[in-house]
């Protein structure tokens, strides 16, 4: 028989697998590590909508920086 800690760990793993599948279906682009960080932040009281906005803004900034680097290296 599985210990309570082992059963809890299996439940956490299963929950994260389901969340990752939902994340993929929604095409969020989050990997397991990023999703895990987001879940932990939400569990600690961070507003999910604010977190989503920050992630989107960071992606925009990253894309803009990459585009800038590409145009600089090509010209």
Swiss-Prot record:
Main location, first listed in the record: cytoplasm
One GO cellular component term noted in the UniProt record for this chain: gamma-tubulin ring complex
Subcellular location: Cytoplasm, Cytoskeleton, Microtubule organizing center, Centrosome; Cytoplasm, Cytoskeleton, Spindle
Keywords: Cytoplasm, Cytoskeleton
InterPro entries xref list: MZT1
Annotated disulfide bonds: none
Family from the record: Belongs to the MOZART1 family.
Its job: Required for gamma-tubulin complex recruitment to the centrosome.
Name of this protein: Mitotic-spindle organizing protein 1
């Amino acid at each position: 028989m599985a210990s309570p800690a082992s059963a809890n760990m299996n439940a956490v793993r299963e929950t994260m697998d389901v969340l990752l599948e939902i994340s993929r279906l929604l095409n969020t682009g989050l990997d397991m590590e990023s999703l895990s960080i987001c879940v932990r932040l939400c569990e600690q009281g961070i507003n999910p909508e604010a977190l989503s906005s920050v992630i989107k803004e960071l992606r925009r900034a990253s894309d803009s920086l990459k585009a800038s680097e590409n145009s600089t290296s090509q010209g």
